[in-house]
Amino acid sequence: MTSPKGKPSPKRSAPAPTTAALTPRTEERTEGATSSASASASSHISSSFDSPRDDTVVFTGYTAESKHNAHGYERLHDIILQDGDTGADSEDGRANEDNVILFPHAEELANAAAGINGDDDNGRVVRLGTIQHLEESDSSEDEPTLNRVGDIPLEWYKDEDHIGYDIEGKKLMKKERSALERLLEATDDPNAMRTIYDALHDEKKTLSNADLQLIFNLQRNRTTNPNYDMYSEVQEDTVVFDPLNHPLARSGGPSKRAFVPALHDMKVIAKMVRRLRKEEAERKLRPGKEEKEEEDQLLWDDGHVEMDTHTHFKYFNRVPKPKLPPPGTFESYRPPPEYLPSERAKQRQARLRAIDRKEHFLPQSFDALRHVPFYHHTIQDRYQRCLDLAFFPRAQRTRLVVDPDKLLPELPDPKDLRPYPEKLSFHYKGHTATVRSVSVSPNGQYLATGCDDHLVRVFEVQTGRLMKRYDMGAPVQQVEFCPSTSLNILAAAVEYSLVFIVPTFAAHTLVNDHTIRFLRAPGLSAGQREAAHALGAVDTLGGRAVTQTTLDADETAHEATADLHDIEEREKRAEFVDASAKERNAGIVVKIAMHAKVKKFCFHIKGDYLCALCPKDHVKYRQTIMLQLSKRKVFCPFRKFSEVVTDCRFHPREPIFFLATTNSVRCYNLMAHRLQRRFKASGGVTTCLSIHPEGDNFLVGDTTSHTSWFDMDFSDKPYKRMRSHRGVVNALAFHPKTNAYPLFATGASDGQVHVFHGMVYDDYNKNALVVPVKILKHQRPVYAVAWHPTLAWLFTSTEDGVVTAWTE
């Protein structure tokens, strides 16, 4: 059996039940009923599960000795009444039959409740309004709740060694049961199927037969007492059934046709249903119509005036007439002197025809408003006004109201796109003029800067230490490391020449020797290059340099392989010049002399080819010059090209060359020797160009503060055109490892560097995702930006000679 608090009780023998009854107040019956019969005809129903009648309330329970079967009802004090003659009525068999057992305990309890055994003397009746004193009992169920944790989730104690606290605050420890003990209990205990677990007290309790009977009745929506008859109160003479007078018994009953609707009735009902559904759908489409009908209506509202369609259209679709312009200063009766016409102007006005005159009068000055004469052109002006109103075009244009916030794309939070450069970490000092270019070595260990103070400086990235300075003798336009890790070359554009430097401290000796032979000995085979690695070298003050024996061998090899038939042609384009002894001591190996100032240049990904731009060369086809360093070849690929070039780049994976002009970007196929595509750069003059490492996208900056993202698979026009700066975009660059860091940066003359997250997907159904993530601010215009090859670090240079490193 389960107590009212959900606490299961162990199985035990059924206690002797007792009856607490409330004898109803009897009423005399007028139709031959005796007083004794009316007193015994009381009705008793369960107070917990059935509705009591107006004249009878009976509660049948158990005595205090067996209060463990009515644990929840012992604490109810003002519930039960007793009449004085209850004992007399208990002898009546009718009264005993009407008693109801709330919680039957098998057949024994039912018989005891009905008074069959004659144990009614053991019952105890309490009057309503008195306190029922509980008697002492040794039953375990009569004990109060041991666990005093209250109404809280018991899951809070699942990780503890106790289940709660008793009334004295002591812990109630858990009972540890092994898996074997639980298995034995489940197999050996005959009452395992009727045993439940009390989680509040950490113990098992067995359900009695009465508990199972109660659960069975509740599951089937029955009364708790199986012996209760809800129709015991009904008198036999109150309900009389005569089969012959029943409607179904007369004339054989109704036919089946009476219950089947007629066909025409079904059609009418279906039509009504369709009309109701249609009205419901229209009501959903116009949710505000019913609300307007419920509101108070204006008495003189034009919306309730009945009018035809034409009048309704003219009334509700009228276009307001255009207003007259306000009078100007020249129409004043006392205008300023500068508005008064001269005699020459009056004569010119008089010579014009009336149709050619802008105004029909000339400004005049009067001392007072009353001196102003009548305007002779009043009627003509009114007539012209009427013509304008009658013939001016009336047109209605639907204005589309769009929320600007809905037009913006949904972008992710920049915090979720980390890492990207956020804070200033390093200052590389020592520059005294504008730093126009920065470049990072392929291994990310060294940083080279080109400055207007004629010096090329190489710093160590991690420490900021100045490793080497190279005096170029003129302002340096650009510096760049060779992207190939097998070559240690630092190239610099200095006015009319390209200078190739070998910073010996930046690579191993074998790499340095291989680089020198790569630049000085064209035509050597791979075996000869490997054999050349074994030649000796000495250290000088200017760095590590090759011996004179090595130089002589290189010069002999160069003279033996020189193309004598192409000397004049080479002189027209560019010329390779070997460095002097002093320059070789400083690390300078080769110079390339140009006919005009070199503005920009770029390396191929393998380091053998190089393209230089000389936009101010008077010979148009020499503006773009390509060089092959290993063979010292010079050629101009664009013979009939006449546009001014601004920047150039090699495709990182394919033999494609990008050339940026003032208003377009040309894409050339170097294998087919033809123009492959042309991209239109809308806006101002292009200033810089950067190719995505995957090769399918590129960026273009211009003088109108715009950065254009081009997708080669999308269109010839920009996929995105971003205006984030307020000055000329001077530099932009993609991160070399976009798979790990999908970033690119733009620097402009407004002193800001904008960092973007630019994700390119392999799926052609997804467009590139461009999200601005950070703005890095400087005091002066930014001229160059460069990314670290393996980290999310950004290097910038400004007009005032500040070179900084921004890290994560």
Curated annotation (Swiss-Prot):
Any single Gene Ontology cellular-component annotation: PeBoW complex
Domain of life: Eukaryota
GO biological process: maturation of 5.8S rRNA from tricistronic rRNA transcript (SSU-rRNA, 5.8S rRNA, LSU-rRNA); maturation of LSU-rRNA from tricistronic rRNA transcript (SSU-rRNA, 5.8S rRNA, LSU-rRNA)
InterPro entries (UniProt xref): BOP1/Erb1, BOP1_N_dom, WD40/YVTN_repeat-like_dom_sf, WD40_repeat_dom_sf, WD40_rpt
Record-linked PROSITE patterns: WD_REPEATS_2 (PS50082), WD_REPEATS_REGION (PS50294)
Localisation per UniProt entry: Nucleus, Nucleolus; Nucleus, Nucleoplasm
Chain intervals for the UniProt region annotation (Disordered): 1-56
Annotated keywords: Nucleus, Repeat, Ribosome biogenesis, rRNA processing, WD repeat
PANTHER family assigned: RIBOSOME BIOGENESIS PROTEIN BOP1, RIBOSOME BIOGENESIS PROTEIN BOP1 BLOCK OF PROLIFERATION 1 PROTEIN
Functional summary from the UniProt entry: Required for maturation of ribosomal RNAs and formation of the large ribosomal subunit.
Family: Belongs to the WD repeat BOP1/ERB1 family.
Protein name, per record: Ribosome biogenesis protein BOP1 homolog
Species whose genome carries this gene: Leishmania infantum
Origin organism lineage: Eukaryota, Discoba, Euglenozoa, Kinetoplastea, Metakinetoplastina
